[in-house]
Amino acid sequence: MSEIKIVDKFINPRDHEELQTVMLQREFPWTVAQKTGDMDRDGKSKDPLNTQLNHWFADYRNIHYSPFFKYVLPIVNEQRIIAISRIKANLQLCTENPIKSDYHVDLSLMYGINEIPEPHITNIVYYVNSNNGYTEFETGEKVESVANRAVIFPNTLRHRGVSQTDTHYRAVINLNLCLSAATPPEFPGG
């Protein structure tokens, strides 16, 4: 797991609690989206269970910042950032059996007709709540969903989310950032 760093108690517990409360309130705006995988001609998932809710905190492609962006600043401020590519929350509802999404990289570039992973991006998966879902890497490593935990890894590592069966929802925040190579990030807690 040399390219994968797990950090527990990633942000101040008060900031985590505030973020969790805001994201799970009735007024928080979620949209329906496909997780990963094949779509039909209409752009809909071929698998009806391949659905989750999203909230875009930031997206450079659309020059979009959510009014809730300030709540992810404690996560962002833990890094030495050159640029934010995107910050997106995912909310999966409980499933009877664990559902594994397709392995993927978060951001790709087109090289001719081939997609290649964006090499200068660092991914952070931040876990909003604890549950028995997890993030699995194609190399076999699994990172359990523990509230206020972050897993940090290069965008070139293929990974997938696995749904939970023990709680009503699994909420994560997926950050894709360009970090300063000159000053490696300091991680709280060691």
Question: In which residue ranges do the predicted regions lie?
Answer:
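Short beta-strand His + acidic residue motifs that chelate non-heme Fe in jelly-roll/DSBH
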Residues: 103, 158-166
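A short glycine-rich, His/Asp/Glu-containing loop-to-beta-strand
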Residues: 81-101
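A short beta-strand-loop-beta hairpin characteristic of the jelly-roll/cupin
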Residues: 98-103, 109-112, 119-122, 127-146, ...
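Fe(II)/2-oxoglutarate
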Residues: 1-2, 188-190
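Conserved metal-binding segment of the jelly-roll/cupin
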Residues: 143-159
